[in-house]
Amino acid sequence: MQRITFFFLFFATFSSVFSQNTLGTLLNTEDSFSGYVLFSPRTSDSNKNTYLINNCGEVVNQWSSTFPLFSTDYLMPDGSLFRSVIDNQSTLDIPGNTGRIEHLDWDGNTIWALTYSDTDFSFHHDYVVLDNGNILMLVAKRRTLQESLDNGRDPATMAVNELYEECVLEIEPVGTSGFNVIWEWNSWDHLIQDFDNTKLNFGVVGDHPELMDINAGTNFGEADWWHSNALSYSPELDQIIISNRNGNEFIIIDHSTTTAEAAGSTGGNSGMGGDIIYRYGNPQTYDQGDENDRKLFAQHDVQFIPPGSPNAGKIMIFNNGQGISFTRVQIITPPYDAVNQNYTYTGGAYGPDTVDWEYLDPDDQFNFFAPFLSGAQELPNGNVLICSGPDGLLFEVDENSNTVWSYQSPVANSGILSDGDDPATEQTRVFRALKYGLDYEGFDGRDLTPQNVIENNPVDDGCLLLSTESFAIESAIKVHPTVTNEFIHIDTQLNEYTVELYNIHGQLLLSDRSVDLLNISEYSTGMYFLKIINDGRIKSVKIIKSN
């Protein structure tokens, strides 16, 4: 009993001094953007709450639901909440098939809600609330085998006898559950193919980047051949981004058209009707490149960066990296011609060739890999909030890729975890997260009194703000890997420092000076604590010795 008690006392002391909590706010520095983070854990029935938390991880508001949450949430300027929840009434096989949008007031009362989902169609993934209160939303519709063949699809590429058409609907909410369709765009009005010359849409794919090749894609066996997963709108340009994950590209269409013009190739500010006015990521889809020309790999959350951020007007992309096993968050400047209200294209692949900014793990690019879900947001101070969706890790980086704030969602399918639990052994997914500044008008007149943190049995105070000096040593020393059966690397430009290794009982096992490589192969499997000391400053890292 005495030995167990000592372990918990040591662990608690080590944790509180050296920030070894596993859940909630893991890092909180004075360089982070002051605000509130909105997110919905993507769990089954264990927890159906959308949370608004401060930088300390304390809840300032939450909204419950009777439906499982999807995690596409927006806090409106009036303090109300739009969110997507799962009420799929269709038989479409689409991961991310949500079906329902809810609009709630600050106190959780329903203002309006719509399930737009039936046997052969469904709202899915993403939507945008416009300034006039209308909603743009992604909708998938079933197309039959015959309809697919009539549009030139190669039957050899159809393992199932249907395809899904991606559409964008603009609806006007009416009453508490009604709507009017205001505008509509359907992707199958803009197809081309070079497989069947008996069809009306037969043509040279490479000569028509404004059209979508019905035989392009990387998942020919699936009905969900586009798998659109993000929608973004620029009110300044009156344009819409659609991210097509399975094509490894995103496209931009003109929203200034009428519905009739959106079905054709003329009209609108661009003069191109509903045709594609810009595309980026994979020129293979329009026969203008090969695999080496690909820029995007199963991307998510492609968005116009809004006014108020340093890179406003540019485009941010969460480039998941499926197929290359590392993830990047990138910002690009598309070749937009403001005079002609269109994008410059002179043949070949659409530019740009290079990105303006990107984040990837600064120590080892393969340390950061989120193969699905996920998103990012540029904040007004230039920092970027990143949501690593598969593991529910939210972290904020500055323009130099230093992590200045991080938060691990404690909500798993099994329930709310306790601090000290290993989230890697649970499913703690989050699709996206957004951060709102303290001065956001949606907070005017609202009670933002901090409540408890979400995690059970917290061992740390997430409001213990790291000073710039304390953060300096965090940034100046990189330790990797933290799970190993042999070597630990210490990367730093510091000349003098002490390295100490402790077991879970607080026993000092090793002490050395200014080394950059430790061999722990002789130690038993289990958990250890590595402490690095420089001029009175301390960095601590939890190490797992594997078999």
Q: Model-found features: residue ranges?
A:
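Sec-dependent N-terminal signal peptides
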Residues: 4-14
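Histidine-/acidic-rich catalytic cores in large beta-rich domains
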Residues: 20-466
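Positively charged n-region of N-terminal signal peptides that target proteins for export
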Residues: 1-4, 545
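Generic extreme N-terminus detector
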Residues: 4-5, 423-426, 513
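C-terminal outer-membrane/trafficking sorting elements
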Residues: 15, 54-55, 469-547
